[in-house]
Amino acid sequence: MQDAAAVRTGKTMAVLKKTELVKARKLWEEVFEEDTAKFLDYYETYVADHNQIFAEEEAGDVVSMVQLNPYRVHMGEAEADSYYIVAVATRESCRHQGRMRRLLAEALQQMYQEKIPFTFLMPASESIYLPFDFVTVYRQSLFTCGVVIPGSNDNCWHCIPCRWEQLKELAEWSNVFLQNHSEISTVRTEDYYKRIWKEQESMNGQILLFYEGSQMKGYCFTGYEGSGEAWEIAVEADNPEEQTGSEPRAASDSQALANRRAVEALTRWFGGQDQLPMRICGFLPESYIDGIPLSEMTYRPMTMVRIVNLEAFVSHMRAKKPVQFVLYIKDPIIPENCGVFCFELGRECSSL
């Protein structure tokens, strides 16, 4: 992996020194005006030092770029390398010239050579990435709350800012939680949360932990830039078999109640900071919030993914029972993925 930025000038590839990455920041500031200098300082220090930046340059200025941030991901019980694509940007005067397509194709080809199973991104618009065979896999729920929502004294949750020395415990808890609720998730480590800690600080926020009494029930990330916001709200539901009256509670109802308690705790926390109204987003997919009508919720495409190296991706697939089938694959960006393939999937291993 390169530790600097790859720059395309005409047909020539060059490698920028890290001290020259200020060129990429200049374009970032032009295109993403909503990002603060404080956030970009964080990004340069804790992210850009180990990512890859594909760019096109004119007259010494970066005019188009695609950045790849490396991540380890859980794929079932195994782990794999992946990249999060971020800061896809082109100077306004240089748009509609095929620059983004060239850079994305270049980045995808390099990831293919690295045997990356898949890559992912947060789209500004789905329509931008559909032609590159990205598909949306997660739509984030969000709503705005302007008042403190009271909770029951019997099961009231409260928020406590995470301490630096708790980050290892948080990593262990969140890995278990995410693997219980998803086949694919980013690997959480103490170092991962140290970086997240710095990111939240750059957005005037922090990592909050949810507690019921002395028991930790989950976490979320927060920020404040004119209004409060909380996201990635990961909270553990009570036992699905617990009773409500004479009927057993469904798992989805149990999760909805946990989400409700988290919302109550968040409104009390932000209300105490005089930061209401606040935006709350990012619960578990397909879960809802007890007592909050669906009509008050909106949804936005949050995560799009694309298979990069088909063989590597299939090697991580598993089937409850052995299965074999043939597919014709057409990939407009990565020709190595094109052809007729026999898929052989099993409980322990899979292959093409």
Predicted regions and their residues:
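Acidic, aliphatic-rich amphipathic alpha-helical segments
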Residues: 260-348
